[in-house]
């Protein structure tokens, strides 16, 4: 009987501890924030370099008057129409465009890109182009200069546009179809 008590005591203690609720362990974080700080500093330098390069291009291009958008890209009207309607969310626009690098080398021709149909703010396209189209009227041809963060960003387009590459888009807005409520 004496040998039964220790076994019973061990069994009861195992039973009691196994029935208790398990406590979640917190992950141990050793992050000092240096990676984020370095990344922020690197992006600030990149943005400043792009801004300097874009400003040089704008200064040399005296044929056009450039405007800076609230979204951080530049644009100039190569052909300004007399229309007064801007596309708004839900409208369907048809446009042609070509993409060059900052030095005028063609990355994608208008023939490669073909005419595009875009549902304003309802489809996913490059952020600069999404915002730029809303500044255009039917018949406008606009030259947009997009810093990399408004273009294809860190990843590029995985084809011809490289990492953190600023680009120039020549866009012609052919048509705006206003969405009609049903």
Language-model segments: residues:
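Cross-family detector of peptidyl-prolyl cis-trans isomerase
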Residues: 19-182
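Sec-dependent bacterial lipoprotein signal peptides
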Residues: 1-19
């Amino acid at each position: 009987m004496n040998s039964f008590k220790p076994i019973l005591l061990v069994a009861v203690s195992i039973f009691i501890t196994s029935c208790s609720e398990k406590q979640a362990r917190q992950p141990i974080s050793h992050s000092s924030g240096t990676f984020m700080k370095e990344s922020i500093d690197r992006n600030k330098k990149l943005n400043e370099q792009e801004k300097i390069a874009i400003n040089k291009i704008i200064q040399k291009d005296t044929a056009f008057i450039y405007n800076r958008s609230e979204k951080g890209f530049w644009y100039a009207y190569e052909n300004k129409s007399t229309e007064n309607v801007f596309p708004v969310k839900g409208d369907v626009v048809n446009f042609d465009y070509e993409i060059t690098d900052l030095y005028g080398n063609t990355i994608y021709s208008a023939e490669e890109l073909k005419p595009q149909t875009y549902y304003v703010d309802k489809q996913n396209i490059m952020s600069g182009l999404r915002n730029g189209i809303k500044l255009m009227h039917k018949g406008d041809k606009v030259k947009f200069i997009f810093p990399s963060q408004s273009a294809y960003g860190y990843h590029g387009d995985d084809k011809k546009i490289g990492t953190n590459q600023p680009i120039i888009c020549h866009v012609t807005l052919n048509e705006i179809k206003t969405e009609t409520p049903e």
